[in-house]
Amino acid sequence: MFKPFGFAAETGSHLLTTQWLQLGNSLCLKERISIAMQVTFLAFFLIHLALKWFGVVRNRGSNDVEEDLKKQSITVKQSFSYNISLLCSVSILGTHCFILLLLFRDSVVSRCDSSVSVFSAEVSQSFSWLFVSVVVVKIRERRLVKFPWMLRSWWLCSFILSFSFDAHFITAKHEPLEFQDYADLTGLLASLFLLAVSIRGKTGFHLLESSGNTEPLLLGDQTEQNKKDSYSSSSPYGNATLFQRITFSWINPLFSLGYKRPLEKDDVPDIDVKDSARFCSHAFDQKLKTTKEKEGPGNAFFYNSVLRYVWRKAAINAVFAVVNASTAYIGPYLINDFVEFLSEKQSQSLNHGYLLALGFLTAKIVETVTQRQWIFGARQLGLRLRAALISHIYQKGLVLSSQSRQSHTSGEIINYMSVDVQRITDFIWYVNNIWMLPIQIFSAIYILQKHLGLGALAALVTTLMVMACNYPLTRLQRNYQSDIMNAKDDRMKATSEILKNMKILKLQAWDNQFLNKVKTLRKKEYDCLWKSLRLQAFTTFILWGAPSLISVVTFVTCMLMGVKLTAGAVLSALATFQMLQSPIFGLPDLLSALVQSKVSADRIASYLQQSETQKDAVEYCSKDHTELSVEIENGAFSWEPESSRPTLDDIELKVKSGMKVAVCGAVGSGKSSLLSSILGEIQKLKGTVRVSGKQAYVPQSPWILSGTIRDNILFGSMYESEKYERTVKACALIKDFELFSNGDLTEIGERGINMSGGQKQRIQIARAVYQNADIYLLDDPFSAVDAHTGRELFEDCLMGILKDKTVLYVTHQVEFLPAADLILVMQNGRVMQAGKFEELLKQNIGFEVLVGAHNEALDSILSIEKSSRNFKEGSKDDTASIAESLQTHCDSEHNISTENKKKEAKLVQDEETEKGVIGKEVYLAYLTTVKGGLLVPFIILAQSCFQMLQIASNYWMAWTAPPTAESIPKLGMGRILLVYALLAAGSSLCVLARTILVAIGGLSTAETFFSRMLCSIFRAPMSFFDSTPTGRILNRASTDQSVLDLEMAVKLGWCAFSIIQIVGTIFVMSQVAWQVCVIFIPVAVACVFYQRYYTPTARELSRMSGVERAPILHHFAESLAGATTIRAFDQRDRFISSNLVLIDSHSRPWFHVASAMEWLSFRLNLLSHFVFAFSLVLLVTLPEGVINPSIAGLGVTYGLSLNVLQATVIWNICNAENKMISVERILQYSKIPSEAPLVIDGHRPLDNWPNVGSIVFRDLQVRYAEHFPAVLKNITCEFPGGKKIGVVGRTGSGKSTLIQALFRIVEPSQGTIVIDNVDITKIGLHDLRSRLGIIPQDPALFDGTIRLNLDPLAQYTDHEIWEAIDKCQLGDVIRAKDERLDATVVENGENWSVGQRQLVCLGRVLLKKSNILVLDEATASVDSATDGVIQKIINQEFKDRTVVTIAHRIHTVIESDLVLVLSDGRIAEFDSPAKLLQREDSFFSKLIKEYSLRSNHFAGSNDLLS
């Protein structure tokens, strides 16, 4: 019925093929194209010479080089690239000259029937290659670094011409090869080498100077050149020859070392200069600026900048990818010819068979070389882009305005740096699929058309339909990806904030509440992940089933059209369908990567366009041109520019050089904002700010960097011992240094966590002093230090070493005001009063309220003192003796005492990493997490069934299809195709089952691992957080967890799938010719050897890469926290340089991991080609009849993919092992030693405990770690219930440690603490901490609202909350905001002043109403008036309760019932204030006298004491 139509189709197809062959054969197409090309080339060359002669063009840099060469005697060391180009050019020239000679003697038969065309073509070729050879020789004389662009273009065109014609004629020829064929083959191989040289472009010359040093001849700026040389000299890749780069043998020395012993960080070589972060960042910055100038802001400018940055390297990668895609289809193209040869072996020459085998092998080798180069090139480009993006995200973070900073938390920005950048660089790897996809599809369709005629159209339509299905799926996937990233941002933001404030959570017993908050955010992320993976599983099912669907549709169409399905045609089609799997499989990954990178790129583009600090906010003048250091005229400033009420308004300020200006005022009056206006940190709405001179800034909340104390003080400046000693002495740090383990080289933990508040404050004051600035801005510098230290700082630092400097200092301590040349009184964002101390007292419009509150406090001290004994005025000698006495009591709270100096104790340990092979227990832990590993055998069974059904369907088609068009099929085509379709459908269903099981198992495992790690971290003791940088934990929670969520299950699955596939392939090949096993076994042994040789090096490099990623994030988090200080000290460039160094430290192992993978893949591919070539030669050599040609063709079909499969197996195993490091790292944090249980069921206290509030310490000793000395020593005392106990002592005497012991933040190493007859070590931590109240030294607010911060457990009514707010003096401030209780609190409470934050913390304890309240410097950051009000409120609200107060303000503790004086971690005194004051020699008595003397000394008059 369909026969006529089918016959017509077959005839039409045959005619098309014949016409194409005639066009190439009978007409002299090659010769004519060749002549045109040579003439064009020669014309261009002559024009170029003429233009050069007349001086129109000039070789870039050549004259400069020649001038340099005249100055010194230099010889050129030749390179492999140059030698191969010269050899190949001369070889091709010789070949054409010899052919020309034979043509003269009529000794050669040409394919072209026109002798004129043949002769003209050879003459033009000879002339062209003569020119080329001469130019190549001249290159050496002129010492050119790169081959001229015209020469490289010529080599490229020659290869295309040779490959297009010669390769086809040689492989299609059935007769024995002649001289012309061998000449063409020689030319083709030489052109291939020249193509490689032209792509690289470099001659590879080195200059050999007379001194004997060898260095590359590079043109351009010499300074830049020196930088390049320093990188290149130690970079094996930078110094590698062309051959070493092709074979990746430049990395051999690293493998040799890694095989002998585990690699260390210093063993990894440097990267090439073009891969260095500095080079990449600078290049990308240029592109950003150029694009922004041309196109303006918007997301498009970011995309265009990236495109401009990557296009050159991406274009080279694209050339390799296109050649790779083209050569991959030569195998399927030749299969039909090979089956025909085997079927008609008697009538054909064996040479033809061997030539076909050589064609197969050559195509596979070219495919391997180009594939390895484009994959490596893509990874290298990804590395460069990652370095550029990370550095720009970092640089942007240093200049974000306050509004932008509030809208982007550090957790979000860390996500940009870790996750989003990774997704963009991953897309660079996938982008080459865009060029390869059309080539692969149309190459496949061409081969199918050649063998199946118009049936190929059915294949094309089906392929396009399958690909079209991806569009709606991709749009849906993009939405899911966007949801995943938003959910991940929310989780990381919360995690980052919790880690920073973990101490507060533990003190307040809120850890469970915030643990549940993270779990809720993770549940949201989990739901998004499950939707994405479920869709991905369905997409995979469609695309894995696609080749089977396409083949069924194509074969059915052929049957209906009457196209004969011979064995050769079917096998060629099956091989082509197999090749089509690559673009179809790759499409969802490409689209997924495209979607993910688009979402990530939009996020980064949006971030890079956020507003920055105003560059013109401050005018900087020279000191010589003005006597004013700071001047503000008619200034208005606001943290929220859109707000109707500015933060500061009507600011007029003139500060002369050398003046001391004090700024005071109530909490939230704008004192810190005034300093920010001088720094240019706050948005300027109007007015002028002028500053003349270098600035130094000390923020209210100490910002301390991880590192040594000396590093923090020097802050990038050179160490000058005399200046340094002077600074340290002025900042009262000498005694602390003596008592630190390593003096000023003692290492500080993250955010100075192992330092007391006073020590951190003095270290950052020393940092400012050492900079020798002209203007000093000190924000409440005395709040965290005791009375004696405060006086010492004021006298020796502010009035001593800084006496000639301009100093603006914010303070709540009135005793430091009289010495100021100018006092500014702030109120509601305005300067209400300005003048000297005496002038302001006389004005009676506000200042006297602050002074009055201080007077009251001082009066209370004096009255108690006088009632105890007669107060005597202290002389200067008394003052000196008191100071001397106080000095003897100094110690360091958190550090090692003098007797332990010799013992090194590093607080922040280097990140723990495993060594050697990843343990089996890690794999087992991962595989057996979900249902004890029950899903694993089902997944393997599903894949095995898929593979068996695939082989069965292909075997069925090869066995049943007739060997020739004339043969009769064994069964009807309808039945053949029905069985084939059923087998194909079965295999697709197996894929669906497998993908769903992998998605379920992988995500469930990831969720279990996350839950375990999260609970382990939350239950870790504070010592873990003290010694572990936040970035280290965040790295595991973001990057490593992302690997488990989306990659790990797929990578492990692919290990099993690829092994099953290769076993199936070997089975089919051994069925065809069992002799293949003879060669396969030793090759398999070689593969295993290579894999084992590779693994130790790659594993350690991967671990290093993972470890080196955390410092980038940690450094970034620290820099964001101290961005204001960095800008104030003008240290941006230094911090950016540190960031670039850290990026390079990560890039080094990462680059060598990528190189190592390519090294392995290249060698494994070559070994698999060896097996394939052996099997082909075996099939050609075996006598006819020994083997069925159709089955032999099936073996070749499977053999074509052997190299890919073999490389895939090893690649997947290595990749899975590298990814398994993330599992290993998460497991490490799932086994952190836990602190005591939250609840102990058998030992739960009564509901009303503690009802009395008595606290008994018995022989208490506390140390921070086993190798650290005791910080508290033999503390034995009792705090009676319902009493007020004051705890005093010099900075670092152990006061805060006592409180930490009370809350069991640190466990006693000896002794007990008993509260109301309950030993606190016997009850659960939650039962203990939830019954105690505390206002900590560092006030912490969480991202959210005021309501959430006051009542995070949602236990109280609005009425109760408002009552607490009014009591803690925040009622008016909060009512003034539109949102009231829902007023926004940003990360760290940055939009509230430090004093307001402390008042919110007070509100918490007023709500909690505990019977025991601890105040740890609770009012250090509020003014005296507010402090007085707060003390009254506490006395009223906690009248019959136990209140333990730590304070540096003596008046805060003078009215206590009992005072505990700590010194050197021991109890110095413990009695009532009155009794202690009766003893002249008591420590407390001396503290009181010191405070009185200080106030009296600085008042300068009796006004203060009246």
From Swiss-Prot:
Catalytic reactions on record:
ATP + H2O + xenobioticSide 1 = ADP + phosphate + xenobioticSide 2
Q: Name one GO molecular function term.
A: ATP binding
**SMART domains per the record?**
AAA
**Domain (ABC transporter) ranges:** 630-853, 1257-1489
User: One GO BP annotation here?
Assistant: response to nematode
Q: Which PROSITE patterns does UniProt cross-reference here?
A: ABC_TM1F, ABC_TRANSPORTER_1, ABC_TRANSPORTER_2
Q: What is this protein called?
A: ABC transporter C family member 9
What organism is recorded for this protein? Arabidopsis thaliana
For this protein's source organism, the top of the classification is:
Eukaryota, Viridiplantae, Streptophyta, Embryophyta, Tracheophyta
